[in-house]
Amino acid sequence: MAWNTNLRWRLPLTCLLLEVVMVILFGVFVRYDFDADAHWWSWRTEFYYRYPSFQDVHVMVFVGFGFLMTFLQRYGFSAVGFNFLLAAFGIQWALLMQGWFHFLQGRYIVVGVENLINADFCVASVCVAFGAVLGKVSPIQLLIMTFFQVTLFAVNEFILLNLLKVKDAGGSMTIHTFGAYFGLTVTRILYRRNLEQSKERQNSVYQSDLFAMIGTLFLWMYWPSFNSAISYHGDSQHRAAINTYCSLAACVLTSVAISSALHKKGKLDMVHIQNATPAGGVAVGTAAEMMLMPYGALIVGFVCGIISTLGFVYLTPFLESRLHIQDTCGINNLHGIPGIIGGIVGAVTAASASLEVYGKEGLVHSFDFQGFKRDWTARTQGKFQIYGLLVTLAMALMGGIIVGVGLILRLPFWGQPSDENCFEDAVYWEMPEGNSTVYIPEDPTFKPSGPSVPSVPMVSPLPMASSVPLVP
């Protein structure tokens, strides 16, 4: 089926409408917080403690996630560009949604540097979900997904952090598990029966894999900042960085080991190195600020590197062939399963907390055992950590079904590409001259009068071996 992918009016109107709504809502509801307001001057503000972490998280969202998805040979523009678009819209909507739940003072949402970090966390979950549908949806569909995912993320985050009192410093549950299974549910709803017609573009080339590795390295380097960005100042934040650092390092070695072991000639697969090596940062997220101990963090990374790499080899093909889950980036192996592992590790670590390990004040401070939680024990905290993981999975699955089915994203007027034109930049981007393409035009107003054929690069005839004419 050939759908009209000309977005000349639909995309501009959608973007402008959303931004006008943001301007109005910000004008009505958003003001600076105490540290940013000129009425109360002080140079000792939260900004100077949090901004370095905010910078690192910001780079991860826009550079790390964006470039990680450039592995597709003909989808680099869209991977980086659409990630940029949905993240830019998502942070605005996240500031409002999270503000209404967490930062409302009177009738105003007060915004400071901590809001910016939390908004980036929310958008990181959106970027995770983007990986599942990469190459198969239009930018309008992505904006719609972002709007509803940010909304559901804020609700789920409020339930976990405010009602269940769950500890999730690095977002193993709220960010990675939610984003992964929301995205996987949506991509299952949007299943493409004839995606094999675009299979040749679903592969990588040398240069695209190299660009994707840049994204991996940015994510890997800055993940300690990501997991510690909103932890309490002092020992909690310090522990979160150390635990993440150790888990990431161990994950690299086991990912490389398993990748080599699974190849009959012992060669490495770049897909595994790009996507399995950062999984240790995901898995240690919930327990990052707990007394996991450095050796415990190494164990988490060790196990996660093995499971993530095995997932790319065996689980992803199984999900596509048996369950019709077309996971473009393999987010189930980088974010989904490691996120669940992180939730379980957090629950076990919390349940095993003791006075000998934490001390009385440390136990109260680390788990907020005061006020509403003053009668809680470590086992109670561990039990509620499991509840939080289950709630997150339920919210992600139900939310993905609602967005995929309830919003009828399969209808052709969203401008999505047809099955034979997935994973192709030329559908939505002006391509440089001389760049070969296998794009089949879908807009009837631009189709040639004859039958549509894939365009191919012009090849000049080879020179003759001799310029002397041949005579019989």
Curated annotation (Swiss-Prot):
Keywords: Ammonia transport, Cell membrane, Glycoprotein, Membrane, Transmembrane, Transmembrane helix, Transport. Its main location: membrane. One of its GO terms (cellular component) is plasma membrane. It catalyses: NH4(+)(in) = NH4(+)(out); methylamine(out) = methylamine(in); CO2(out) = CO2(in). The chain crosses the membrane at residues 10-30, 52-72, 77-97, 115-135, 140-160, 169-191, 210-230, 242-262, 295-315, 337-357, 389-409, 451-471. It comes from the Eukaryota. One of its GO terms (molecular function) is ankyrin binding. InterPro entries: Ammonium/urea_transptr (IPR029020), NH4_transpt_AmtB-like_dom (IPR024041), RhesusRHD (IPR002229). The keyword Transmembrane helix applies. It is a multi-pass membrane protein. GO terms for biological process: ammonium homeostasis; ammonium transmembrane transport; intracellular monoatomic ion homeostasis; transepithelial ammonium transport. Belongs to the ammonium transporter (TC 2.A.49) family. Rh subfamily. Ammonium transporter involved in the maintenance of acid-base homeostasis. Transports ammonium and its related derivative methylammonium across the plasma membrane of epithelial cells likely contributing to renal transepithelial ammonia transport and ammonia metabolism. Postulated to primarily mediate an electroneutral bidirectional transport of NH3 ammonia species according to a mechanism that implies interaction of an NH4(+) ion with acidic residues of the pore entry followed by dissociation of NH4(+) into NH3 and H(+). Homotrimer. This is Ammonium transporter Rh type C.
